[in-house]
Amino acid sequence: MTVALSLEQGAHLVSMARKTIETAVLERRAPNRDELPAWPEGEDGFLQSHRGAFVTLTNSDGSLRGCIGLPYPVKPLGEAVVHAALGAATRDPRFPRVRSDELRALTVEVSA
């Protein structure tokens, strides 16, 4: 049985994805764990639960800019979101890598 995300959990995952994308685009690397937003106290177990996750990027006009994910629960949720965010920004075969001048206009969505 899959447990739905709370609004706070969802917002936190989006913050993690955005930080991952910014680091990948601006510094051409994945962020270290300590560079990601801290998970709310008492909820770190949720971040460690194995879940599938997708990160979708859209432009300001609503057009797709990237989408990559893990459909199966093969990684802890935090790792899955970082993996999907990196993929959506840098490895979606339909699009070139996200550029630094695109970052401000991108909408980041996490599905888990």
What are these regions (language model features)?
Residues 1-112:
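Basic nucleic-acid-binding interfaces
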